[in-house]
Amino acid sequence: MSTSTAAPAPSLSDLCPAALRRPVAAALRALDPAPARLAVAVSGGADSAMLAVAAAAALPPGCTLRLFHVHHGLQAAADQWAAQVRGLGALLGVPVDEARVTVPPGQGLGMEAAARLARYQALAGLARQHGVRHILLAHHRNDQAETVLLRLLRGTGLQGMAAMAPLSERDGVAYLRPWLDVDRAAILALAGAVRAQCGWQAVQDPTNTDPRYARAAVRTQLAPALDARWPGWQAIVARHARQMAEAAEIVAEVARADFDTLEPADAGRSFSLAAWRGLSAARQAQALRHWLASQDAPMPTEARLAELQRQLRQLHALGHDRHLRWQHAGRVVRCERGRVWIDD
């Protein structure tokens, strides 16, 4: 008499479709040298949790994976979210590391921006603690489209319209966003499959649908109207962001090349005023932006930069004995003996 044995249930990694696994694998293959340690920033929501599943499925040989969770304490259910992340780590067989932060009020930042700053600082701390150089973030095509709309409405420039980059560095950590061309519907489908398989359910952040927050207002009020009139608009806007990123890179290359002709000295702290005046107005502005960024100075508004540009153009009428002193964010730009300097 023969007996039949039920097939073993698939692991969570087996549930991950190629459309979600392949972008992660491609992002990891592009890293040189290949990382020995990798982390996923996991809030407990569907997006970051499913990225953890995809990362476990795409993890190359010789690389270890960790989940980093930042506990903000901003929501009553924050402890439950942390528990959900620990549960996901147990299902994946992956260690979970938690950092608790307090989001300070004020600092001239809104709550969204302050929480984001605290989160990045906490992630950098966890990365240093565990020797991790690369962290995966779960931003997807819908997030990218929302970012472009928000920045457009806030009057951003070319660099801002490029929105989120697939790879960026901050505080010594490389952040990878492999899903910027992935629609969220595919992520939610995997979350549903995971829930059906093992009962693990993603947490719901109420701020994601609270229109008091700018991004949530775009998501709940503007996006539905665009969905109805222009289905698939997120892909179009995300493509626009990629094109803006290419354009911004070209502008940056021109600005670097122009600045190199300005006789820079003292580690780039000064340049020739006469050489700068030989540039067109648009290239003067880009050279100034490049210079300020290279000196770790906060980027001024368009109006403030135009004022600096105007003053530099008019210096010839003041004579060499009259020194420009343009103050910005604790830094001072001055002109002396035909050279423009920036001081702390």
Curated annotation (Swiss-Prot):
This is tRNA(Ile)-lysidine synthase. GO terms for cellular component: cytoplasm. Ligates lysine onto the cytidine present at position 34 of the AUA codon-specific tRNA(Ile) that contains the anticodon CAU, in an ATP-dependent manner. Cytidine is converted to lysidine, thus changing the amino acid specificity of the tRNA from methionine to isoleucine. Keywords: ATP-binding, Cytoplasm, Ligase, Nucleotide-binding, tRNA processing. It holds the Pfam family TilS. The keyword tRNA processing applies. The keyword Ligase applies. Its EC number is 6.3.4.19. It catalyses: cytidine(34) in tRNA(Ile2) + L-lysine + ATP = lysidine(34) in tRNA(Ile2) + AMP + diphosphate + H(+). Its main location: cytoplasm. The gene is tilS. GO terms for molecular function: ATP binding; tRNA(Ile)-lysidine synthase activity. ATP binds at residues 43-48. GO terms for biological process: tRNA modification. It comes from Bordetella bronchiseptica (strain ATCC BAA-588 / NCTC 13252 / RB50). It is an enzyme of class 6 (ligase). The N-terminal region contains the highly conserved SGGXDS motif, predicted to be a P-loop motif involved in ATP binding.
